[in-house]
Amino acid sequence: MSKLRMVLLEDSGSADVRRHFVNLSPFTIAVVLLLRACFVTSSLGGTTKELRLVDGENKCSGRVEVKIQEEWGTVCNNGWSMEAVSVICNQLGCPTAIKATGWANSSAGSGRIWMDHVSCRGNESALWDCKHDGWGKHSNCTHQQDAGVTCSDGSDLEMRLTNGGNMCSGRIEIKFQGQWGTVCDDNFNINHASVVCKQLECGSAVSFSGSANFGEGSGPIWFDDLICNGNESALWNCKHQGWGKHNCDHAEDAGVICSKGADLSLRLVDGVTECSGRLEVRFQGEWGTICDDGWDSHDAAVACKQLGCPTAITAIGRVNASEGFGHIWLDSVSCQGHEPAVWQCKHHEWGKHYCNHNEDAGVTCSDGSDLELRLRGGGSRCAGTVEVEIQRLLGKVCDRGWGLKEADVVCRQLGCGSALKTSYQVYSKIQATNMWLFLSSCNGNETSLWDCKNWQWGGLTCDHYEEAKITCSAHREPRLVGGDIPCSGRVEVKHGDTWGSVCDSDFSLEAASVLCRELQCGTVVSILGGAHFGEGNGQIWTEEFQCEGHESHLSLCPVAPRPEGTCSHSRDVGVVCSRYTEIRLVNGKTPCEGRVELKTLNAWGSLCNSHWDIEDAHVLCQQLKCGVALSTPGGAHFGKGNGQVWRHMFHCTGTEQHMGDCPVTALGASLCPSGQVASVICSGNQSQTLSSCNSSSLGPTRPTIPEESAVACIESGQLRLVNGGGRCAGRVEIYHEGSWGTICDDSWDLSDAHVVCRQLGCGEAINATGSAHFGEGTGPIWLDEMKCNGKESRIWQCHSHGWGQQNCRHKEDAGVICSEFMSLRLTSEASREACAGRLEVFYNGAWGSVGRSNMSETTVGVVCRQLGCADKGKINSASLDKAMSIPMWVDNVQCPKGPDTLWQCPSSPWEKRLARPSEETWITCDNKMRLQEGPTSCSGRVEIWHGGSWGTVCDDSWDLNDAQVVCQQLGCGPALKAFKEAEFGQGTGPIWLNEVKCKGNESSLWDCPARRWGHSECGHKEDAAVNCTDISTRKTPQKATTGQSSLIAVGILGVVLLAIFVALFLTQKRRQRQRLTVSSRGENLVHQIQYREMNSCLNADDLDLMNSSENSNESADFNAAELISVSKFLPISGMEKEAILRHTEKENGNL
């Protein structure tokens, strides 16, 4: 950390300056000299740097010197490497690094030693981009250790191929320092050969060889153990040990054959068409064949493409044509499919094989004009039997080797979406011999069926007598919208590009079962009518789904048309699915005991027991018709299981009918300890239900029930937190004797709150609130004077006055805030927008950021919807703002499609750590207001995002003041006109606002008086609109380049410093003239004060002269309470959460 030291000097070079400095205050002198130091440091950073080589034999060799601050200096050779030499050589236009030396060939340098311990990767653009100790810092180096280099611009280097019959094949030889030498074959491969061929302009590399295949050379062996990536411009630019360093002899000389020296060509012989037949290759003037060992569709695809017949129909082994003769040039060809020529695929050395000519390879290709694919007999072009027509022959696809991946490829090729169903049609044995297409397999990503590998075509026999049939989605898909948990919400179906809702009278239990199964959400739990999940907007489909319940997709259900206008959005149907496809107990002695396993996305996995409790177990036993939960054995009581261990945390109360009804969280879930999987032992009595326990046992004297066991009854005392904005914060309420009631705050403290939080699975208590912090409750006040020791498993096990014994009122209702309470916000020092900034999560009593690893647009959409900030957004680059003192809580958040809150998304476990702004997530959600159907972005129909959907504004009372607020909010110029009566067309969805009465100076439309959200008697023919000037009212500063910015800053700083100094000097001069007497003795006793900057410019909290020496340094630790600041709160999902955070700050501030 930078410090200032005050030094008293006995002498000074200028009496006049000394005399005036004496009269300046210490603070003024400190500021002036501090600014001066900053000016000098800034100037150093902006100084132009230069590099040169001195005292060498030519411009590409010599001692390395760097110029900075107009002063030349040297570089110490500590850690000097060939990587650093490569950087210097490239920087100076001498691209070939020859040698790294401590320059002893000439006189030592002089002046500064600017750099030491230089460490380069080799790809830096300048030497000063490499790591080093710092400018002017070195470890006692002298100029005897000055670093030097020897480079080459290539003009003195040559390469040739010899003894190969032409200039593009043969033994590699390099001329260096006037002498020809060879290259050792150690680690020599096709990448090296590619560099050689490219450098000699001989085309691509066909083959390489070692062991002096082109004869032994003579002279030096210049290179050994070369490392090339294939992109180098010259062989000597590959990494190497150094010129002339090797452990080889000339029996290991390397050679290459390039395409221009191989006389290569490919042809088809003896085929029925121009694109079929036996393959032959010409190599070094002679034709030969290819052996069929390993010959497959990838190899055929390369050959066909090379021959100008781009689609490979069949890869033929033991080709049905007259046998070839002559050489067998290639064997064991293995192509990836993207190579430009067959000989560029992997293969044995040219001419080496283990074949004879009855194994010659061939192909049947097509130019695509004679290939056709279609679906017939299914009622539309996107359903039916798969038919293919190849070279004018019509055939079917045999279902042998046929599956959903292959069907997906067909649907995609035909523009019919994805495959919903694949089946087969049985034919008689007589019809089985036909033209058939056989597929080995598709990976599902191909753009057409012809791209799938190893397919065969012809008059073959389909052993199964079955032809493939497909039903495609045709871009028709369902979804659930607006639910609080995944797999629940309003039913919407997409036809083409349009989403629409479904009337509750048109959706049966069978249809809901199909929907849940299609969405991989398990089984249907309930069907809810009356727009339970909110009203949709847009289309209401006038069709009844007549499913039987066994269909795999909703699109496969028959539909019956309904008359239009018979339904409204107030009757939109909703569905709740179980989310989990299946849930089961395994490895137990009976079906009603065992390890808990969930099936999600067709994969079974065990459930972690870190949050598994008896309430969760009760619900599972009931769902499986196994009575009630008797115990939840810990550890791997029924075995560890295989596959994934699900970290999802259920939060059941014990009264739910299905596990899908319980809230679930996944964000920040810890990795499951080895072997810690959930288990349960149910009573097994399928007719048994949970009866009410004797309420007399629920008093303070009730014995503690171990968490791993429970009585087979529902305790009358259920517990919940109300009005806190989440399940882990709020007013404490207990269900007792048929009524919900509260707890009085007398003696209410953290020990009591700990029991509540632990009982609810919400971690530990952060705050125990009183005075009806979360609002006054109703009904009985059940408990008073709670005195928990903090270890009880239920709040009613604590000592108290007894049930209903109290002298309180509801203004004394107790509440809690637990560590598992979570909230979300976007915050930025540079923006007041609540919908833009750094993504932060409130957890364990503190705000922390969210990492940007694997952050996707889907996850951003979940965040923006959760915050009520439109339905999507974008990820921004790291903010340039100063990073605030805040840790990172969680990283690797990966939301799938479906969750409505970030809490339901998997992530890395909670871990508090420091993070740079570049590691954090910065988001800007789309504007919650937009203008639609206008000629420009600043005119059109006004639409607002609210409650999870877009809606319009009614034109009642709509005027220019309202329009002015809209224009300002959208960043447009002043309002020109406020339109009524759907000037830009009628919108869809809700009419969110009516009777808007702005003054014109509000910052947003929702700050204006209006009727309650969604309360309107208007129709869309009254949609309001605006026309704004298309001139932005937001000032966007012009961005200067880095160099311009630094120069401008330095110039301004210099002018300011000069002005300050002149003003101070004149002021002090005037004061001196006004003095009546001056004691020369006193003046001589005055000492000068000089402030020296010891390291770098000061931070404000480092000025010892301006701060009391008694101030203590702040701890670097992040105390949870210290991280909560009222001044930085933003609204978070409602007033309740804001109240929680405000109270937490107040409580922690009093500690």
Swiss-Prot record:
Modifications made to the protein after synthesis: A soluble form (sCD163) is produced by proteolytic shedding which can be induced by lipopolysaccharide, phorbol ester and Fc region of immunoglobulin gamma. This cleavage is dependent on protein kinase C and tyrosine kinases and can be blocked by protease inhibitors. The shedding is inhibited by the tissue inhibitor of metalloproteinase TIMP3, and thus probably induced by membrane-bound metalloproteinases ADAMs. Phosphorylated.
Glycosylation-annotated residues: N105, N140, N854
Pfam families: SRCR
Family annotation (PROSITE patterns): SRCR_1, SRCR_2
Topological region Cytoplasmic: 1068-1151
Extracellular side: 46-1046
SUPFAM superfamilies named in the record: SRCR-like
SMART domains tied to this protein: SR
Disulfide bridges in this chain: C76-C141, C89-C151, C120-C130, C184-C248, C197-C258, C228-C238, C291-C355, C304-C365, C335-C345, C398-C462, C411-C472, C442-C452, C503-C567, C516-C577, C547-C557, C608-C672, C621-C682, C652-C662, C744-C808, C757-C818, C788-C798, C864-C925, C895-C905, C954-C1018, C967-C1028, C998-C1008
Keyword NAD attached: no
Signal peptide bounds: 1-45
TM region positions: 1047-1067
Record key words, sorted: Acute phase, Cell membrane, Disulfide bond, Glycoprotein, Inflammatory response, Membrane, Phosphoprotein, Repeat, Secreted, Signal, Transmembrane, Transmembrane helix
SRCR domain sequence ranges: 51-152, 159-259, 266-366, 373-473, 478-578, 583-683, 719-819, 824-926, 929-1029
Membrane topology: Single-pass type I membrane protein
GO CC field: extracellular region; plasma membrane
UniProt motif Internalization signal: location: 1091-1094
InterPro entries: SRCR (IPR001190), SRCR-like_dom_sf (IPR036772)
PANTHER family per UniProt: SCAVENGER RECEPTOR CYSTEINE-RICH TYPE 1 PROTEIN M160, SCAVENGER RECEPTOR DOMAIN-CONTAINING
This protein's domain notes: The SRCR domain 3 mediates calcium-sensitive interaction with hemoglobin/haptoglobin complexes.
Function: Involved in clearance and endocytosis of hemoglobin/haptoglobin complexes by macrophages and may thereby protect tissues from free hemoglobin-mediated oxidative damage. May play a role in the uptake and recycling of iron, via endocytosis of hemoglobin/haptoglobin and subsequent breakdown of heme. Binds hemoglobin/haptoglobin complexes in a calcium-dependent and pH-dependent manner. Induces a cascade of intracellular signals that involves tyrosine kinase-dependent calcium mobilization, inositol triphosphate production and secretion of IL6 and CSF1.
Subunit structure: Interacts with CSNK2B.
Protein name, as recorded: Scavenger receptor cysteine-rich type 1 protein M130
Lineage: Eukaryota, Metazoa, Chordata, Craniata, Vertebrata
Gene designation per UniProt: CD163
